[in-house]
Amino acid sequence: MWHSWTTSANADAYESPLRSAVFDAIARRDIAGYRGIELLRRRDGDEVAFVTLMWFESLDAIRAFAGPDAEIAVVPLAAQALLERYDARSAHYEVRVPGADAAGLIARPAI
């Protein structure tokens, strides 16, 4: 889980390349154990907040994506230029109770 914030003026400019190029580029890396990515967005006062959720099967898979220190955030320079601030480190959690979609009950919208 990783948090970032930008201005209202930059929010669409930040989100658009994520949806059209960055997320596809991550998938094309064909990292063993990578299961997908989700992007959440909401207004947060004068800013727009984003939460990126990436799904991996193991810490080894996360390291294959991020490098030896799996908590260092991977933020492309072009994205950094559009952000007001962002977490320097990402947080990793184990899924303890899968969501309803994991049981096939609801589908997440395609990004």
Task: Give a label for each model feature.
Residues 10, 60-62, 98:
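Residue-level signal for secondary-structure boundary sites
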Residues 5-18:
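Short, surface-exposed ligand-recognition loops at beta-strand->loop->(often short) alpha-helix junctions
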Residues 35-49, 74-111:
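Glycine-rich beta-strand-turn "strand-cap" elements at beta-sheet edges
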Residues 10-11, 21-26, 37-39, 48:
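Short secondary-structure boundary micro-motifs
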Residues 20-32, 55-92:
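An amphipathic, aromatic/His-enriched active-site/gating alpha helix that lines ligand/cofactor pockets
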Residues 1-5, 36-70:
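Short, well-ordered beta-strand segments in beta-rich or mixed alpha/beta enzyme
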